[in-house]
């Protein structure tokens, strides 16, 4: 896996400092190369400077794709040039702000961004609106230390980050903190610990880490941004700019690093993930465990369990309600057994909120994970669900996750869940047919299969859609859930206990 990081400034010290920080956090099989700009500003602290950085960013994007990089990160919280870069390239291109804000929205109901200067606050507000997350943004607060001074006095920076984070929690109601500059790399755990010591238990997200883990996940899943949202620009002469990667200025690349051999401090923790099947029936366990196991990276341990009381399948709100008590029991057991994360194997995300109140380890809902990923890769997504009667439930979920405006449509294949395993070919054909209609008739730019029983179908559906001229990405929600779980374990993050506080300690008759 080859990941290129573009540091969108001309300051060589920033470029040199960036490489070891990414390498230390990357997977052992990831090769990280870093490049700065040959023309542009020394730091980015205004729209004006962002605009002047973009032309050379695009040159670097062309070069990265020509050099067969698997993914690319633009290392700045302004996400400069993200949209035009995605028009220009087919490989995944990740913006730290987009990745971190969506991750914050998955883990908490309200996040605050602690940024650099007062003048950056309107930018944060704008990005939250652009990414459809305005309702999640509690505040943006500055440390009032210019970018070029961030690395000169780390103690002063940490004190300012802690001070503004405390104010964000106490005064603004933030449940999770997002650093507002990639120049704050490597300080998240230190700030989180300092907040804990002051009595404020909130997760702290490093946007560079969020971007890296998203890039790794996209490469693993073979996904990229939708070319219907980001179509290639029309061919035309653009005076004064190179049209091909070979025409660009020299790259001045730092040598690619294979972290497996070069950095003994690299994150190598093996994630232990429990998949909870929220229906009754031990016959589900082996195939589910095998299917999820294929999505995990080498070393990830995945075990599956089914519930012992509840419905045989989930196709209604009633079914979901009757499954949740047993799901919660399994969540408790998973944490007691030392699991690192839990995935709920159902696109209804049954019991996600109470499970997060109950547990401190990450609990992942496939629908939440897949919808947020779809919103990052495209402007409009469609969900292909099971039955017609389940369509309102999908719309409720999109509303719950603040993504209603991103939904192009919800379509059903009208094959009951209990019949899906009997004829996978029939199910795949039905998903392809409804997906094609979603693209051609509803304007979908990306497809989300709406049942975890459709696991593993995404590549086939995506290929068949392309053959029909409906080329869009297709997300595999279970695979995305595994990737999110692995990334959270790598980053030492979980949901916010301010959004999901532990339930009161009291007797509940009939339950453990």
Q: Regions from the language model: what does each represent?
A:
Residues 1-16, 111-115, 267-285, 381-385:
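Short beta-strand segments enriched in small/hydrophobic residues
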Residues 4-7, 25, 29-30, 35, ...:
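C-terminal alpha-helical cap/extension of soluble enzyme domains
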Residues 13, 106-141, 216-250, 283, ...:
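Short, glycine-/small-residue-rich phosphate/pyrophosphate-handling segment
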Residues 33-55, 148-153, 306-325, 418-423:
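N-terminal beta-loop-helix "entrance" segment that forms/cooperates
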Residues 46-63, 156-164, 316-333, 426-434:
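Glycine-rich, highly charged phosphate/nucleotide-binding loops
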Residues 69-76, 174-182, 339-346, 444-452:
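Periplasmic-binding protein-like
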Residues 86-107, 192-212, 356-377, 462-481:
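Short, acidic/small-residue loops that bind anionic groups at enzyme active sites
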Residues 128-181, 190, 398-451:
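Active-site rim beta-loop-alpha module in soluble metabolic enzymes
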């Amino acid at each position: 896996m080859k990941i290129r990081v573009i540091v969108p400034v001309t300051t060589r010290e920033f470029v040199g400092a960036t490489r070891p920080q990414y390498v230390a956090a990357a997977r052992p099989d990831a090769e990280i190369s870093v490049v700065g700009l040959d023309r542009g500003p020394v730091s980015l602290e205004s729209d004006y400077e962002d605009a002047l950085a973009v032309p050379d960013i695009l040159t670097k994007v062309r070069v990265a794709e020509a050099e067969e990089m698997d993914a690319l990160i633009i290392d700045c919280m302004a996400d400069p040039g993200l949209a035009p870069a995605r028009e220009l390239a087919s490989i995944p291109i990740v913006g730290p702000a987009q990745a971190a804000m969506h991750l914050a929205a998955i883990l908490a109901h309200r996040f605050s961004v602690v940024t650099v200067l007062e003048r950056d606050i309107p930018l944060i507000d704008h990005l939250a609106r652009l990414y459809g997350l305005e309702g999640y943004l509690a505040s943006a607060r500055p440390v009032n230390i210019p970018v070029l001074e961030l690395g000169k006095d780390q103690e002063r920076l940490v004190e300012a980050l802690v001070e503004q984070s405390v104010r964000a929690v106490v005064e603004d109601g933030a449940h999770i903190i997002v650093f507002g500059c990639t120049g704050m790399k490597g300080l998240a755990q230190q700030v989180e610990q300092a907040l804990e010591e002051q009595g404020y238990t909130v997760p702290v997200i490093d946007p560079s880490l969020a971007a890296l883990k998203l890039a790794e996940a996209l490469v693993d899943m073979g996904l990229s941004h939708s070319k219907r949202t980001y179509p290639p620009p029309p061919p035309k002469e653009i005076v004064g700019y190179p049209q091909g990667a070979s025409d660009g200025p020299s790259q001045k690349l730092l040598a690619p690093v294979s972290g497996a051999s070069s950095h003994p401090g690299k994150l190598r923790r093996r994630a232990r993930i429990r998949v909870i099947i929220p229906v009754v029936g031990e016959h589900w366990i082996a195939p589910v465990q095998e299917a999820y196991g294929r999505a995990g990276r080498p070393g990830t341990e995945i075990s599956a369990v089914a519930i012992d009381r509840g419905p045989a399948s989930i196709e209604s709100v009633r079914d979901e309600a009757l499954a949740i008590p047993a799901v919660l029991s399994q969540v408790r057991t998973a944490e007691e057994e030392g699991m690192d994360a839990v995935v709920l194997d159902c696109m209804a995300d049954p019991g996600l909120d109470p499970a997060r109140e109950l547990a401190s380890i990450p609990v992942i809902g496939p629908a939440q994970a897949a919808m947020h990923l779809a919103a990052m890769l495209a402007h409009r997504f469609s969900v292909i669900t099971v039955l017609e009667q389940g369509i309102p439930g999908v719309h409720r979920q999109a509303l719950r996750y603040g993504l209603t405006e991103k939904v192009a449509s919800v379509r059903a294949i009208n094959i009951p869940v209990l019949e899906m395993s009997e004829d996978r070919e029939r199910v795949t054909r039905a998903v392809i047919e409804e997906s094609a209609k979603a693209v051609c008739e509803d304007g979908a730019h990306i497809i989300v299969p709406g049942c975890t029983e459709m696991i593993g179908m995404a590549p086939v559906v995506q290929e068949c859609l392309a053959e029909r001229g409906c080329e869009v990405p297709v997300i595999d929600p279970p695979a995305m859930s595994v990737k999110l779980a692995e990334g959270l374990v790598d980053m030492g993050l979980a949901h916010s206990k301010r959004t999901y506080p532990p339930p009161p300690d009291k007797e509940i008759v009939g339950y453990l």
